[in-house]
Amino acid sequence: MKINGNEIRPGNVIEHQGSLWVAIKCNAVKPGKGGAFNQVEMKNLIDGTKFNERFRAAETVERVRLEQKDFTFLYQQGDALIFMDSQSYEQLELQKDFVGERAAFLQEGMTVTVELYQEKPIGISLPDQVSVTIAEADPALKGQTVTASYKPAILENGIRILVPPFINAGEHVIVDTNELVYLRRANDKG
């Protein structure tokens, strides 16, 4: 669908210069001289590079609609991650580097959302929060309760995060998969 350059909003996926880009930031600029334009910071969906572009109001760009499908993670085979389409039961194989460091959070049976463009996967979304076990954590030092302090810990999947001093090895915690940060203990209600 064609849209004007001044209609681009954050989160829109557009086709520009032969690639797919997602708009991150948009700033409408009205200079004293000349016509108004939309300053757009974009990220390439294929290789992750960032790019700034000015779009005049009269310019048109192709806005792309991505298909989103739910897949269930089945297993890992070497560097390949095997997923199953929840509707058609077809299997999809993605390379581990396609998912990035968040691949360590994949668990058997976990539902993920894969973004497809012309039947080709271009992005994957894991659940925002997952429960994992702390494999190693330094013991808490006395007197560390006055200020908000954190200590390093290693999760069962090998990811390093910072946790509060009261968290010990063997405890289950909730981790934000986007920011890779500790949120709370897994048995907490909040």
UniProtKB/Swiss-Prot annotation:
Q: Which UniProt keywords apply?
A: Cytoplasm, Elongation factor, Protein biosynthesis
**A GO molecular function held by the record:** translation elongation factor activity
Query: Where does it localize?
Result: Cytoplasm
Q: Does the keyword Transmembrane apply?
A: no
Q: What Pfam families does its record include? A: EFP, EFP_N, Elong-fact-P_C
**Which GO CC annotations does the UniProt entry carry?**
cytoplasm
Q: Which InterPro entries match?
A: Elong-fact-P_C, NA-bd_OB-fold, Rib_uL2_dom2, Transl_elong_fac_P/YeiP, Transl_elong_KOW-like, Transl_elong_P/YeiP_cen, Transl_elong_P/YeiP_CS, Transl_elongation_fac_P
Primary location recorded for the protein, binned into one broad class: cytoplasm
Cystine residue pairs: none
Q: In which pathway does it act?
A: Protein biosynthesis; polypeptide chain elongation
Entry annotated with the keyword Lipid metabolism: no
Q: From its record, what is one biological process in GO terms?
A: peptide biosynthetic process
HAMAP family documented for this protein: EF_P (MF_00141)
Mind telling me which NCBIfam families this protein's record contains?
efp, PRK00529.1
For this chain, the family text in UniProt reads: Belongs to the elongation factor P family.
Q: What does this protein do?
A: Involved in peptide bond synthesis. Stimulates efficient translation and peptide-bond synthesis on native or reconstituted 70S ribosomes in vitro. Probably functions indirectly by altering the affinity of the ribosome for aminoacyl-tRNA, thus increasing their reactivity as acceptors for peptidyl transferase.
Q: What is this protein called?
A: Elongation factor P
